[in-house]
């Protein structure tokens, strides 16, 4: 009996210890569980945040690509033309109006617009202004500098040249107008003036467009001399370095898929400066000789008539 009492006394301290320790383990377990949940929540939240950031970057990149779509004047399938225009029309009401009235435009103009957003202002006023010329000079001119003139400029681009408007057919006259301005320092010869003269003198045919003869003997009445030269890197660089602008007739390539005239105005960083009468974008670039030379099928150098 006495032994049983002693065992009970020994068990009491152990029971007290357990009564203290068990709640502690429970509390620690609860805290650990809470912390574990917090860690998991944080991991999930971090994953959501990372995913959101990546999606935002994708959207921004996509928008940047849409806003900087590079376009040119090459021939495309009519279905592609309208697909491009309809895509742009989603964010530009002017394109919607052009498409709604597409029957008033030559197919070539719609094609050009699909490759050159800079033309939208010209297109928007086409029906009202076709056939009209709105200026008799090209603006301020500095002798020795060659202004970039665009064949679709609203000041003369609605004028008729041959079987269509200067915006479509006028790359040759527009190129010559740049050369005349730079060599003479005068601003009173517009692309329309040269186009009108070219047509009246038989330098334009509906089948072939502007004849090469306009680039040489045809331009003499405007106070400059044009001479056809053999294409070589030495010839091209010598002429430009001596202050003689060049006009090039282009094969299909970066500038056209049919035929086109551009002006070569100088050399910078050993590259060629180009004035393309149908593209601000291409005119803003410097061109490697090895890129541009294979596309040239005719080349003329110019100087001021004595």
Predicted regions: what they are:
Residues 1-14:
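N-terminal Lys/Arg-rich, disordered targeting/topogenic segments
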Residues 13-18, 27-203:
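Active-site-adjacent structural segments surrounding the nucleophilic cysteine of cysteine proteases
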Residues 27, 31-37, 72-87, 97, ...:
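Conserved active-site-adjacent core of cysteine acyl-enzyme catalytic domains
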